[in-house]
């Protein structure tokens, strides 16, 4: 597992950030899904099926994050399963990948329900017995959210049909489609709905390609004056920044850190310029001295030792 994969899983597994992410994608920023109403689920999806030789085939996929969400909204209570798939790079087959996760999650629900009925022997008809599922049984809806953590614009498919070639239009109504739920930083137009520091992460990712815009965001958004350590670490990793983090600090003033970094860069540039100037002066003086010594009849070896440069360099000076 790469450093980016590990960081993304740990970062968004936090219930407060997970809820914030889901509320912005699913409810337009309204605080409907609460952190305390989220429960971890096993991220391993395992589904078995019979192969052509009647042997059981087991398929296994590992999700990034998968949680059970209990939602109370509009006077009603709901339960939904929400998975988050993090992408640091564009995935050009993401609809198939996510659809497979969802199908396996539904398949597991049917499998567990069938086990329960076999154990309790409570199916009423042969159809229900063969299905392992009764007319009264219900599935828990599954939602998968794709979080793109790159700085480029997303140019990958957004639905299964985007991956098709030419298709007879008369057939389209009979072909099930699948749409991904994508969060891409470059496409966010309003950050005010975010309540956690994922806002700062997405704002930086949106502007990472333009240093002037990045500077403007950091100077004008006071939210960057207090950013938690984990978010700054995520920003450094995904946006490619190099914000200094004091080991003793849990909250970082990114505005100040960014300005200090710029100043250090300017000072380093000036120092390098001074060093370069000093070196050029030393070489120029050495050339003058070498020519004088040559006129006096000194050997190349003696001249090189005197000006403290190698003999090959001195030879080039004297023949040019």
Spell out what each predicted region is.
Residues 1-320:
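Elongated, amphipathic alpha-helical interaction scaffolds
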């Amino acid at each position: 597992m790469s450093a980016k994969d590990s960081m993304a899983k740990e970062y968004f597994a936090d219930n407060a950030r997970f809820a914030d992410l889901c509320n912005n994608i699913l409810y337009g920023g309204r605080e409907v899904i609460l952190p305390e109403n989220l429960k971890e689920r096993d991220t391993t999806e395992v589904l078995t099926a019979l192969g052509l030789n009647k042997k059981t085939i087991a398929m296994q996929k590992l999700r990034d994050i998968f949680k059970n969400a209990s939602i109370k909204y509009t006077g009603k209570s709901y339960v939904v399963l929400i998975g988050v798939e993090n992408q640091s790079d564009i995935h050009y087959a993401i609809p198939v990948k996510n659809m497979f996760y969802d199908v396996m999650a539904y398949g597991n629900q049917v499998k567990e329900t069938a086990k329960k009925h076999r154990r309790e022997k409570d199916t009423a008809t042969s159809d229900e017995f063969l299905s392992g599922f009764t007319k009264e049984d219900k599935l828990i809806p599954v939602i998968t959210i794709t979080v793109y953590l790159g700085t480029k614009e997303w140019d990958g498919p957004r639905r299964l049909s985007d991956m098709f070639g030419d298709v007879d239009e008369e057939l389209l109504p009979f072909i099930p489609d699948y749409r991904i739920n994508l969060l891409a930083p470059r496409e966010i137009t309003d950050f005010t709905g975010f309540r956690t520091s994922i806002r700062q992460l997405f704002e930086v990712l949106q502007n990472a390609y333009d240093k002037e815009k990045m500077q403007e965001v950091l100077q004008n958004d006071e939210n960057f004056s207090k950013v938690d350590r984990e978010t700054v670490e995520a920003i450094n990793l995904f946006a490619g920044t190099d914000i200094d983090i004091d080991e003793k600090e849990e909250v970082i003033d990114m505005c100040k850190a960014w300005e200090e970094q710029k100043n250090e860069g300017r000072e380093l540039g000036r120092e390098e310029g001074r060093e370069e100037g000093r070196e050029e002066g030393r070489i120029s003086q050495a050339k003058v001295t070498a020519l004088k010594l040559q006129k006096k009849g000194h050997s190349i070896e003696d001249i090189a030792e005197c000006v403290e440069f190698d003999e090959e360099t001195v030879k080039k000076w004297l023949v040019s």
